[in-house]
Amino acid sequence: MKKKISEQEIIRHQKMNELKKINIDPFGKKIVPSHSIKQIILQYQKEDSLAFEQSQINVCVAGRIVLKRGQGKAGFLHLQDFDFRIQAYVKLDLVGKDAFQIYQNCDLGDIIGIKGFLFKTKTQELTIKALEFIHLTKALKPLPDKFHGLQNREDMRKKRYVDLIVNEKTRQVFLTRSLIMKYIRNFFDNQGFLEVETPILQPTLGGASAKPFITHHNALNCDFYLRIATELPLKKLIVGGMNKVYEIGRLFRNEGIDATHNPEFSTIEAYLAYADMQDIMDLTKQCLQELVQKIFGKLQFTYQNQEIDFSHFAKVSMVASIKEKTGIDFTDHFTLEQCLSLAKKHKIEVMPHFSQGHIIEAFFGKYVENALIQPTFVYGHPLEISPLAKQNEFDPRFTDRFELFIVGKEFANAFRELNDPIEQEKRFLNQLKQKQLGNEEANDMDYDFLNALNYGMPPTGGLGMGIDRLVMLLTDTANIRDVILFPHCKNQNKFI
């Protein structure tokens, strides 16, 4: 099937051929800019006209044409690199007839180079007066116009390269994402953690409760999982004597897509030997407060019209939060039958593998989670839903585990790590029973991890934190796919 081509594209192809006729490569050669547009703006924007008259400041820049105006023997254009743009003035008498002809024929979206000097117009706009106009790349497709192009969010996600060109908001989101990644990495480096890399392809499913992607390793002739967590390999490194480790990377969960879930997502996981749950809580709070302070210059900001305050992190047990909303006290020793009866009364769906702990979690999800707007540590998760966490010393039905909730969503999951290999094996066996009852998110038996624990793992605290949701929060973005450069979309590989 022959692809359709618009009238504008036909004209642009003709212009490409015209460039070839005069021995100009439509797709350009190397240029060495003296400055980025950002450097020019930051360095010279505040200078007055007199400064440019007293000393000629020569520059060479490259960028994409995003605006063009003027007729006759002179005109203006705006060049954009990524996060900054600058005006250029192109005049026939200065650049010469041949170069001016190329300027007249150029289109929005073309990439060009300008050599010239800086001045300020009568309206005090910083401008480059062109002495040379250099064609670099012909854009064969037109950019969407300001009012009618790329209005559909799904189109923006499919064609992120166009979205980045035309939408400043998108550019700012991904610049901020890069800063967030850098700040997080610097924080853990400065705390003395060692950054490591662990395999994406895993022979055993474990480290979290999730449905996996499965692939086949031809050379080894066996199936592998795309990792759903980095937890177990990182804890093996704790056994090996790496007492402070972290990894920033991609995880994969073969589950649904919605505003806060994407099957491929980024996390940081960090593990600290000789630490407990409170230590990890303090570490998480310090990391996030420093991050918010660096992004906003203060600890308060707005997300989706809600004022969020990071100066204080609340702390509440899971069962206490449920009691506050429902009056039900799950610290009472309810039987499974009593819990099932309560679930039925409160119209909570129950799966065949559900235990008391699963029902407690379901109550929390229905009555509490969405109401946790300000930063809140929720601790004391039931044992049955926490197969890798250590039991609480005072009530072994619960664990020394916490999750961080903000704006009604989970942002971090952490616990005092279970380091007893005998107890861990029992937990894995229970997970296998849950899988037989239909729990698709249950873990496998990881014999190598058990073997590692038998060599002795020191008391350890661990943290997993989602980076994409953090970027959403700190850029006031409502959908997770708008903070991922190339999210998965339907019909993504069509030529459009």
From Swiss-Prot:
It is an enzyme of class 6 (ligase). It comes from Aster yellows witches'-broom phytoplasma (strain AYWB). GO terms for molecular function: ATP binding; lysine-tRNA ligase activity; magnesium ion binding; tRNA binding. The gene is lysS. Its cofactor is Mg(2+). This is Lysine--tRNA ligase. Homodimer. GO terms for biological process: lysyl-tRNA aminoacylation. Binds 3 Mg(2+) ions per subunit. It holds the Pfam family tRNA_anti-codon. NCBIfam families: lysS_bact, PRK00484.1. Belongs to the class-II aminoacyl-tRNA synthetase family. InterPro entries: Aa-tRNA-synt_II (IPR004364), aa-tRNA-synth_II (IPR006195), aa-tRNA-synth_II/BPL/LPL (IPR045864), Lys-tRNA-ligase_II (IPR002313), Lys-tRNA-ligase_II_N (IPR044136), Lys-tRNA-synth_II_C (IPR018149), NA-bd_OB-fold (IPR012340), NA-bd_OB_tRNA (IPR004365).
